[in-house]
Amino acid sequence: MRLYPLVWLFLAACTAWGYPSSPPVVNTVKGKVLGKYVNLEGFAQPVAVFLGIPFAKPPLGSLRFAPPQPAEPWNFVKNTTSYPPMCSQDAVGGQVLSELFTNRKENIPLQFSEDCLYLNVYTPADLTKNSRLPVMVWIHGGGLVVGGASTYDGQVLSAHENVVVVTIQYRLGIWGFFSTGDEHSQGNWGHLDQVAALHWVQDNIANFGGNPGSVTIFGESAGGFSVSALVLSPLAKNLFHRAISESGVVLTSALITTDSKPIANLIATLSGCKTTTSAVMVHCLRQKTEDELLETSLKLNLFKLDLLGNPKESYPFLPTVIDGVVLPKTPEEILAEKSFNTVPYIVGINKQEFGWIIPTLMGYPLSEGKLDQKTAKSLLWKSYPTLKISEKMIPVVAEKYFGGTDDPAKRKDLFQDLVADVMFGVPSVMVSRSHRDAGAPTFMYEFEYRPSFVSAMRPKTVIGDHGDELFSVFGSPFLKDGASEEETNLSKMVMKYWANFARNGNPNGGGLPHWPEYDQKEGYLKIGASTQAAQRLKDKEVAFWSELRAKEAAEEPSHWKHVEL
């Protein structure tokens, strides 16, 4: 009987420490959801976590290759305490990416389904009060073909910075981006899902303690690309108020096309569908089971370098399309016309974007640690679908990047710099300049740090690889073991910059190294073991590639100018 006082003491302590005695239940427009409280070491106030809230109807049957529809209402308390399935994708690729990028200590068991339009919410708010905290909506990466929301646990960012974190899912691969280039299957379904999730945030986030008038969208890689596309999209107007693109912007040409017909025909053919008309293709593909489409997907060899085929007929990505809806015109035209959502914007890259993870996943033969001139040029041509460097320009590019060395090891490093510049560095600076020139507050960063959590297979020389900043942004040192004080402080600093920006459109604040705005002086922040301002990120590279592309366009008028939209 003597236990009773202890039990009461425990319950009293729980309540005193802000740990409510019953789990959180929140009203959404469609029905009530039940979450759970998680306590983070060092924080009295727990974070309420809701996993797998539906923001659209399952995109099945006739809703495959169709815009997302509103979720059906429910009249019970929906249990949202377990991870939703990730969108259909190659399970091996999805698993690898999740294990490489997660900030969790333990890997979560992954499930995949075509029924995947769910989001997760992490809120530090006292749900009995009317809080209006800044909202940060995360769009995951994975080349628009793999990935999921639950890889990224939002509790640390939420607790440390007192913000509501929402992680969203969107259709991927064939399901998300199949486009016949006409009304039968316009494409960009994945982006329409992202817009639908932002509408859900506007309608519901206030009940989770969030302020729908202060929404920051942020994402990495294809997620950063998606953020950049939403900045340009009229559909997303007023659905967010600031944006952060980490290692990916809409000028990354591998992920965008004006002509989706060839890849649509390829998908239909690989699926055993006739390609006589768009309507026939779409009807046939809608009849396929999820597994059959997955089989087709695997045959496409997405995100792989094709060393054998004709580079002009290789499709390693299922890209976003200029559909006249999500993107009314090409990104270049929208940026030039300054007709986009001029919200405050952080754009950044990592020091070695093509350091290890991307070349490894894509199957680049770089493991020997050296490249001769002939192989380097051949790889540039084989990379045409990703880099879009014409055969004629390869000697010019090779001379510019490798001309000064005969050392095959150095040449390999320079080859990796070249690919990183084309895929990430140059497009990021060009987007930032356009944003700045349209009068919107713009901030740039370059991240250079090797997290302690990365794969042991990765060479020690790779510092600031693609995805390395994720461990800082999502507070890995507070969930995983083994981080140094330096790494822990770096994560605190990055979370503070990101959340300051979410709060007021400027990352600066007390105790942080000053981050200059990206203006005509082109000041930016180098983030790493020592964090300091610098100037003119990649300006020489941008000058070289701009001139080269202009020359290319003059000699060979780009076919997209004549494509009927």
Curated annotation (Swiss-Prot):
FAEE-synthesizing and PNPB-hydrolyzing activities are both inhibited by DFP. Changing S491T: No effect on the hydrolysis of PNPC or PNPA, no activity on cholesteryl oleate. Increases activity on PNPC compared to activity on PNPA. The modification N6-succinyllysine is found at K382. One of its GO terms (cellular component) is lipid droplet. One of its GO terms (biological process) is positive regulation of cholesterol efflux. It comes from the Eukaryota. Residues 1-18 form the signal peptide. Optimum pH for FAEE synthesis is 7.0. Optimum pH for PNPB-hydrolyzing activity is 6-8. Glycans are attached at N79, N489. Keywords: Cytoplasm, Disulfide bond, Endoplasmic reticulum, Glycoprotein, Hydrolase, Lipid degradation, Lipid droplet, Lipid metabolism, Microsome, Serine esterase, Signal. It catalyses: all-trans-retinyl hexadecanoate + H2O = all-trans-retinol + hexadecanoate + H(+); a carboxylic ester + H2O = an alcohol + a carboxylate + H(+); a long-chain fatty acyl ethyl ester + H2O = a long-chain fatty acid + ethanol + H(+). Detected in liver, lung and testis, but not in kidney (at protein level). One of its GO terms (molecular function) is all-trans-retinyl-palmitate hydrolase, all-trans-retinol forming activity. Gene3D superfamilies: alpha/beta hydrolase. Changing N506S: Increases specific activity against PNPC by 6-fold and against PNPA by 8.7-fold, no activity on cholesteryl oleate. Disulfide bonds join C87-C116, C273-C284. SUPFAM superfamilies: alpha/beta-Hydrolases. The active site is at S221, E353, H466. The keyword ATP-binding does not apply. A motif (Prevents secretion from ER) lies at residues 562-565. It is found in: Endoplasmic reticulum lumen; Cytoplasm, Cytosol; Lipid droplet; Microsome. Major lipase in white adipose tissue. Involved in the metabolism of xenobiotics and of natural substrates. Hydrolyzes triacylglycerols and monoacylglycerols, with a preference for monoacylglycerols. The susceptibility of the substrate increases with decreasing acyl chain length of the fatty acid moiety. Catalyzes the synthesis of fatty acid ethyl esters. Hydrolyzes retinyl esters. Belongs to the type-B carboxylesterase/lipase family. Homotrimer. This is Carboxylesterase 1D.
